[in-house]
Amino acid sequence: MVRATCLLASCVLFALLLIVPASAYPRYPSNYFREEGQYEPEEIMDMLNRLGNLIQMERKMENYKEDITSEKRALDLGLSRGYSGALQAKHLMGLAAANYAGGPGRRRRDAH
């Protein structure tokens, strides 16, 4: 008897879970069309301006993504060039440090 009651209660609960979300949806699609009157020209222009701004922002984001992915002067540690490329990168970094005024090497005395 307890099994049958539990089964019946679970079936009713399952049916309610299916019915409640379906009743929340509108019966007729409105498509954002107002039947009570004409649209104001200011509203239409405002909507078109917002749409234009969104399109411009999307284009800027696409260009920004392309600029980031195709960056030629990105930090390159030689990892993508193999072992010899990594050695060459270390050599070039050493040359750059040697050419730097405060870089490694023997400190020269000032000639006074």
Curated annotation (Swiss-Prot):
Ribonucleoprotein among keywords: no
Subcellular localization(s) per the UniProt record: Secreted
Keywords: Amidation, Cleavage on pair of basic residues, Hormone, Neuropeptide, Secreted, Signal
Chain positions listed as propeptide in the UniProt record: 25-71, 108-112
Annotated tissue distribution: Expressed in corpora cardiaca (CC), corpora allata (CA), antennal lobe (AL) and gnathal ganglion (GNG) (at protein level). Expression in CC, CA and AL detected in most animals, expression in GNG in few animals (at protein level).
Gene Ontology terms: biological process: body fluid secretion; neuropeptide signaling pathway
Proline amide carried by residues: P104
Signal peptide, first to last residue: 1-24
Primary location recorded for the protein, binned into one broad class: secreted
One CC-aspect GO term: extracellular space
Molecular-function annotations in GO: diuretic hormone activity; G protein-coupled receptor binding
Domain of life where this protein originates: Eukaryota
Role noted for this protein: Regulation of fluid secretion. Stimulates Malpighian tubule fluid secretion.
Family assignment from sequence similarity: Belongs to the diuretic hormone class 2 family.
Name under which the protein is recorded: Diuretic hormone class 2
Native source species: Agrotis ipsilon
